[in-house]
Regions:
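N-terminal helix-rich module
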Residues: 2-14, 41-67, 71, 75, ...
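Alpha-helical hydrophobic helix detector
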Residues: 29-45
Length: 199
């Protein structure tokens, strides 16, 4: 084979290989269409999974905050309150987080002269709201100097977008916490009376 024929043959093979490596516009459109269909099918599942995760994970955030407040009250021999609020003040909005603070006069607000903040537990809720329903009609939880709730037994209710995402953290008269059960395993959690709770 002569050198000129070899160069010509190599050049034609190079051109042939170059065209085989590319993708056509039709192939790109098909791939984009398939990806769009998969995303459309997966989005409801992902959102449902995230809502369920938020509802189930809430107990792991709330229970330690309540236990810390209870032990702080007993160890320091002072009243400790928990309210819904930011890291610096009680707003009454539990979605902002749980603010734990020493509450000398049991009024549920931070008095700068006597009270100080112990901790703030951010909740970062995206799919539901958190509501405190307690005895005595208070908007906050108070642990007395002995570590027992002061008329504050009740529940922190998480109200999701659908009833299957509703959850509750129950605070007993002794200051213990437990999560709401699903006794009949129907996917709907019940209140302390065994009825599905409604937000």
């Amino acid at each position: 084979m002569t050198l000129q024929k070899y160069r010509l043959r190599t050049k034609s093979l190079h051109i042939l290989n170059h065209h085989q490596n590319g993708t056509t516009l039709i192939e790109i459109i098909i791939v984009i269409g398939i990806v769009a269909i998969l995303v459309a099918l997966a989005t409801p599942f992902i959102q449902s999974w995230r809502q369920n995760f938020e509802a189930n994970n809430l107990f792991q955030k709330i229970s330690p905050a309540l236990k810390q407040a209870r032990s702080s009250a007993a160890l320091r021999n002072v009243a400790v309150s928990i309210c819904g609020g930011t890291s610096t003040s009680c707003t009454g909005l539990w979605r902002d987080g749980m603010l734990t603070f020493i509450d000398i006069n049991h009024n549920g607000t931070i008095d700068s002269a006597t009270d100080h903040i112990i901790a703030h537990t951010p909740l970062e809720l995206s799919y539901g709201v958190l509501i405190w329903r307690g005895a005595g009609g208070r908007a906050h939880i108070i642990y007395q100097e002995n570590g027992l709730p002061l008329g504050s037994n009740g529940s922190l209710r998480y109200c999701g977008q659908e009833q299957k995402y509703h959850r509750s953290v129950v605070l007993s008269m002794m200051g213990h916490t437990r999560r709401s059960p699903d006794r009949n395993l129907d996917g709907i959690y019940e209140d302390t009376n065994g009825r599905p709770f409604i937000c």
